[in-house]
Amino acid sequence: MRYDKLTAKFQQALAEAQSLALAADGSYLEAGFVLKALLDDQNSGAAALLAHAGVNVPQVKQRLQQHLNSLPKVSGQGGDILPSRELQAVLNLMDKAATKRSDAYIASELFLLALVQQNDATGKILKEAGATEQNINAAIDAVRGGQNVNDANAEDQRDALKKYTLDLTQRARDGKLDPVIGRDDEIRRAIQVLQRRTKNNPVLIGEPGVGKTAIVEGLAQRIVNGEVPESLRNKRLLVLDLAALIAGAKYRGEFEERLKGVLNDLAKDDGNTLIFIDEIHTLVGAGKTDGAMDAGNMLKPALARGELHCIGATTLDEYRQYIEKDAALERRFQKVLVGEPSVEDTIAILRGLQERYEIHHGIDITDPAIVAAAELSDRYITDRFLPDKAIDLIDEAASRVKMEKETKPEAMDKIDRRLIQLRMEKAHVEKEKDDASKKRLELIDEEINGLQKEYADLDEIWKAEKAISDGAANIKKQIDEVKIKIEQAKRQGDLALASKLMYEDLEHLEKQRAAAERADTDSTKPANKLLRNNVGAEEIAEVVSRMTGIPVSKMMEGERDKLLKMEEVLHRRVVGQDEAVRAVSDAIRRSRSGLADPNKPYGSFLFLGPTGVGKTELCKALAGFLFDSEDHLIRIDMSEYMEKHAVARLIGAPPGYVGYEEGGYLTEQVRRKPYSVILLDEVEKAHPDVFNILLQVLDDGRLTDGQGRTVDFKNTVIVMTSNIGSQHIQQMGIQDYEAVKEVVMEDVKEHFRPEMINRIDEVVVFHGLDQDNIRNIAKIQLKGLEKRLEKQNLRLAVSDAALDIIAKAGFDPIYGARPLKRAIQSEIENPLAKALLAGNYAPESEIRVEADGDRLKFA
């Protein structure tokens, strides 16, 4: 027996058999242990070969286990166990069979043949299960495909297509693929390339999420349905699993052997198999080690000769980075460009997928939800592509509704929490013996009984609604299964079965579904329903809001009233400046009502005016109004961008420079918070080149950062503030607004280029503040102090006379409202801080600030 000529797979089986014999306290290594090791190994192919030969494999396994259990046991056996005489005889027969077949190595399938030839106990088990020398020989010939075993790893290369590929056409027959809607031109172009004599390899190139893999699935469905030219009919479409090819390839050359096995199997198939390689750029460099070939180079000859019918898919960037660099590989593929579908096409795609998602989640998806998913994803999710991003919205909204359906409704949850609270209170009150506690106990018992009854009623309604909903979902699932069976029966030509399924089973299920839907509608009025069972446009809008931070939910009456009273709300923080507040309010109302140009920012303004008149404060008030938080204000001090090279800090350093990976300050902030107020403060202090990057933002609402990513500014309000022309505003005072603006604009035109001014929606001039304005600002600022004192359980009351003194002390026509803050600090906060530290005011007391001549006094 030539032990050195055993294949790696059979050597592994012998080692495993040795372990089994030791574990069973066997006296010898019997042939039965080797057979068990082969049958237990999923990758050995022994079980498949026996099944191919018509042997009852489960019977073999059962009888074999009984035989091994009956063998004599030797306790305390140490070291290796020697092969029994029967096993040595079987191994010798294997050697003879290998020589007869001209094999260089002895493969594990010859062990099965030798067992049948040898008339020992294990051989009898095989014969009783239906094994004969003739049918085992025939099965070996079928498995080998006419090839000899010429190297130790020959068994690993068998059935390479089964191990390293997935059959898409079989999945299409089983109804496991989603329907592919549209994309006819791309599928037709791919078929056209596949029918060429040479270089018949299409590569689908497009952005991530546009549906490249779906096109291949569509082709698989067409092949199964016979909707392809004659030359492609009955072909198999397999997906190459490159990860499985590479995984576990420990030794040099092992990966190449596996790939060669796949190529050999494809060559044997004589062009009846198409192979799809997703992310085809991963072939370039796959399996590459020092001096070894990579997968891309191994595929080139087969691709050029037309032996390998390959369909590739990759993104534009990766095609350029990997495939285009290798000109020899590139010329073997024919490009099929896959563009992003339009919103209308996406709606059609979603309607095609609607039923699959309804069955998966067990809920209904309405048509308005489908339209909203396509339109809102196109408008607000700008860094991804249709239809993928629209499908994601539908999937996530459906998942959310399903989660709500499977958990306790909010109304019941509130009652549950209240009951827990009351029971805890009852436990404490029961310990008390006074009359008040007894009365309280009666009230608690009464409330608990009422809530328990209400909870029981709601629980009954919820369970009934859930049962109806689950029943309808189950019927939908059965309908889908019947439809798949109808398609399979039609393909097999079994028209009798197809008509039975269609006119009996399907009609019966459709009636059941209609009845279930009627029961769902009649069970409770929509207002009283505890369960939400469908996805509408509002659910989609909620998901978009959560994903992007953009409030796109349908405008409620409260928000409409809020927008109509926007000036009033902003004037609570910004005193005077009626023209500025009106201009900003009009821009926001235009955008929120859907009348503004969707491809531009919500509004772009240039605020001009002297220091301290409320330019920056209006931006803060606007951010607070729109988002209930000033965190959505992106403030950039333009005095930091006085040098020409500082532009790179806004959009990110170009490739090759330090900080390239970090991105730009402005672009990164807007990517994270796409719905923001952008304040470019003191804009006239920036270098003129900074304005060049703003032109694109103001006109198209987008900006390309240093890494080539397009950042969307369409949901931002851009405000630039400047002190240009402030001397004219101070000299002319509060005269005719248009006259002041005309004079100031002359200075603006000298500083900014015409193309910059032309792109700004509105230039707003802020006028100086008068004594009354300062008095009103003092009231606003003192409210902030009142809130801080409230935290210390103190109240603040400022008399009108005291307010006049503060306003007078804080009034300066040149510096605006900023001196007022200093006046409040010196006149009120400083003396008050000393008094508080001295302990002059007890908690809950009121601090009154009154006038005492020209000074203030505290009481």
Swiss-Prot record:
Top-level taxon of the source organism: Bacteria
Positions contributing to ATP 2 binding: G609, P610, T611, G612, V613, G614, K615, T616
GO cellular component: cytoplasm
Domain Clp R: start-end pairs: 3-146
Region Repeat 2, residue ranges: 83-146
Name of protein: Chaperone protein ClpB
Keywords from the named record: ATP-binding, Chaperone, Coiled coil, Cytoplasm, Nucleotide-binding, Repeat, Stress response
Function: Part of a stress-induced multi-chaperone system, it is involved in the recovery of the cell from heat-induced damage, in cooperation with DnaK, DnaJ and GrpE. Acts before DnaK, in the processing of protein aggregates. Protein binding stimulates the ATPase activity; ATP hydrolysis unfolds the denatured protein aggregates, which probably helps expose new hydrophobic binding sites on the surface of ClpB-bound aggregates, contributing to the solubilization and refolding of denatured protein aggregates by DnaK.
UniProt record similarity statement: Belongs to the ClpA/ClpB family.
Positions of the UniProt region annotated as Linker: 341-549
Subcellular location: Cytoplasm
Subunit structure: Homohexamer. The oligomerization is ATP-dependent.
Signal peptide region: none
Any GO MF annotation of the entry: ATP binding
Residues the entry annotates as binding ATP 1: G206, E207, P208, G209, V210, G211, K212, T213
Annotated spans, Repeat 1: 6-71
Gene3D superfamilies cross-referenced by the UniProt entry: 1.10.8.60, Clp, N-terminal domain, P-loop containing nucleotide triphosphate hydrolases
Species annotation: Neisseria meningitidis serogroup B (strain ATCC BAA-335 / MC58)
Positions of region (C-terminal): 769-859
Comment, domains: The Clp repeat (R) domain probably functions as a substrate-discriminating domain, recruiting aggregated proteins to the ClpB hexamer and/or stabilizing bound proteins. The NBD2 domain is responsible for oligomerization, whereas the NBD1 domain stabilizes the hexamer probably in an ATP-dependent manner. The movement of the coiled-coil domain is essential for ClpB ability to rescue proteins from an aggregated state, probably by pulling apart large aggregated proteins, which are bound between the coiled-coils motifs of adjacent ClpB subunits in the functional hexamer.
Region feature (NBD1): 159-340
GO biological process: cellular response to heat; protein refolding
Coiled coil (residue ranges): 391-525
Primary residence: cytoplasm
Region (NBD2), start-end ranges: 559-768
